């Protein structure tokens, strides 16, 4: 494990290193909540856990800065628990093993948690700083952002006192975000009665892995391979040409990550197994050709293993309906933003498929900066899976964050950034969900901007943070807080 505590700036890396020792996957945050409250006590700042499970810290103004506008520093405490399939890491009990790799910090075959652990570490650094001059500062560290923005959605009105919100969940240094997409979760489910398999049939487990995966918002425009969509093309052909039957399917495990692995168990006549292996080899070549220049094609693995024939499988009519619905389901970019042609407006991610033992479940995350189109793609999915006899439910809907190019804090941030770096910052809207829109719905007076150091491949086991960006990010933060204007 690399000692990232020795990296500069020490204030950020020491606190981030401490965070990596505390398990904090979404949905299992008791340890990190206790850790943050204990940290605040040792730092001598007020802190409490609100009814939503968020941690709020308050640090009074430096003497002479009491009349400055109040600043809320905001980040989320949870991380996406993604890992290589053969990794033994337990996100609920094990610390993250960090590795320094040139100008990058990464983890050992797991997500790193820099999304949004670096934001949390920055809040910690501000709260414990003794030589930093600033007005009133609050830290809002939210719960379960990655699985539905629950902490922001349940944030009590009247809890925060600040005038400015600095969100620390942007992942490209030099970009200053003033708008983001809304989103909605779509879940299709079906209970079915399994049927007995033909005892004379063989069974194979077909695995597709080695895809990049990635963030289903930020990286959806790259056209990366979705393991579920690739798998359904093969399965549909195997069913049609080789009399294969579906026993089970497992693909993807995070709603907001492009699935990079999928596996199915198929039964089929023994005499067709060799033809199935040939078909898999052909599909592997096809995927390598289709995704050349997008995926690391030499890492793509697509193979079959002989397994014991399961006793039960999916009834043929239900199997065919499920395959058709998954095949027809839209995945990827649906529309680019008319006013910002380089930005995705609307997309969907066929994130998780679980079929077997009498239950089928499909989970999709749709995103759009246009509320009408968000509802359109959700009802499109509802139509698609309803035709397969599935029950479709919507949850976790949140609106987009509408840009305000006239923002005072944006102007101030851009001025300080140029003073320090000699170049103009880039003002951006992103095709990802940020908590800003939800917080603004409860605190509409806030002036908001989002920024942070560069992270690559968040939500994947390839996640990494660029070391050289963290020092200028911290320098910007310190000067911003010192120069916040008076009320």
Residues covered by each model-derived region:
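Active-site metal-coordination/substrate-binding segment of hydrolases
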Residues: 65-163, 189, 203, 316, ...
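Acidic/His- and Gly-rich active-site-bordering loop/insert found
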Residues: 3-103
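His/Asp/Glu-rich mid-to-C-terminal helical/loop segments that flank catalytic regions of hydrolases
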Residues: 158, 223-241, 268-273, 320-327, ...
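Midchain, well-structured core segments that form catalytic/ion-binding scaffolds
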Residues: 103-106, 146-147, 153-367
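Zn-dependent metallopeptidase/amidohydrolase metal-coordination segment
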Residues: 9-12, 338-341, 345-360, 365, ...
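Substrate-recognition/cap regions that form aromatic- and gly/pro-loop-enriched pockets
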Residues: 343-429
């Amino acid at each position: 494990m690399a000692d990232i505590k020795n990296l500069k700036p020490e204030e950020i890396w020491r606190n981030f290193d401490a965070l990596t020792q505390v398990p904090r996957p979404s949905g299992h945050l008791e340890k990190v909540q206790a850790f943050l409250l204990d940290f605040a006590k040792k730092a001598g700042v007020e802190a409490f856990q609100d009814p939503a499970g968020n941690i709020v810290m308050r640090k009074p103004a430096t003497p002479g800065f009491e009349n400055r506008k109040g600043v809320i520093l905001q980040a989320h405490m949870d991380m996406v628990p993604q890992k290589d399939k053969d990794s033994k890491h337990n996100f609920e009990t094990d610390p993250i093993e960090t590795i320094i790799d040139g100008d990058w910090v990464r983890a050992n075959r797991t997500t790193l948690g820099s999304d949004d652990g670096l934001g949390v570490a920055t809040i910690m650094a501000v709260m414990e700083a003794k030589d930093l001059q600033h007005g009133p500062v609050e830290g809002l560290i939210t719960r379960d952002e990655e699985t539905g923005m629950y902490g922001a959605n349940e944030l009590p009105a009247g809890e925060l006192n600040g005038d400015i919100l600095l969100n620390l969940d942007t992942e490209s240094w030099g970009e200053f975000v003033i708008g983001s997409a809304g989103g909605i979760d779509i879940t299709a489910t079906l209970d079915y009665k399994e049927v007995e398999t033909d005892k004379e049939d063989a069974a194979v487990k077909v695995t597709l892995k080695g895809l990049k995966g990635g963030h289903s918002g930020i990286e959806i425009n790259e056209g990366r391979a979705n393991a579920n969509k690739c798998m359904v093309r093969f399965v549909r052909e195997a069913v049609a040409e080789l009399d294969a039957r579906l026993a089970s399917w497992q693909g993807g495990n995070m709603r907001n990550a492009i699935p990079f692995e999928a596996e199915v168990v198929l039964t089929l006549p023994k005499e067709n197994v060799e033809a199935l292996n040939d078909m898999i080899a052909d599909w592997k070549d096809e995927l390598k050709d289709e995704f050349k220049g997008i995926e690391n094609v030499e890492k793509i693995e697509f193979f079959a293993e002989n397994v014991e024939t399961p006793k039960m499988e999916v009834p043929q009519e239900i199997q065919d309906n499920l395959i058709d619905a998954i095949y027809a389901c839209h995945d990827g970019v649906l529309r680019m933003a008319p006013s910002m042609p380089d930005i995705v407006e609307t997309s969907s991610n066929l994130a998780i498929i679980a079929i077997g033992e009498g239950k089928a479940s499909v989970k999709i995350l749709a995103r759009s900066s246009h509320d009408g189109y968000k509802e359109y793609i959700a009802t499109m999915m509802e139509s698609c899976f309803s035709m397969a006899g599935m029950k479709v439910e919507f949850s976790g809907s949140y609106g987009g964050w509408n840009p305000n190019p006239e923002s005072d804090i944006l102007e101030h941030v851009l001025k300080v950034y140029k003073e320090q770096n000699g170049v103009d910052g880039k003002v951006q809207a992103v095709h990802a969900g940020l908590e800003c829109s939800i917080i603004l719905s409860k605190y509409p007076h806030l002036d908001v901007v989002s920024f942070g150091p560069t992270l690559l491949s968040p939500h994947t086991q390839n996640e990494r943070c660029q070391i050289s960006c963290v020092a200028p990010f911290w320098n910007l933060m310190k000067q911003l807080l010192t120069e916040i204007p008076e009320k």
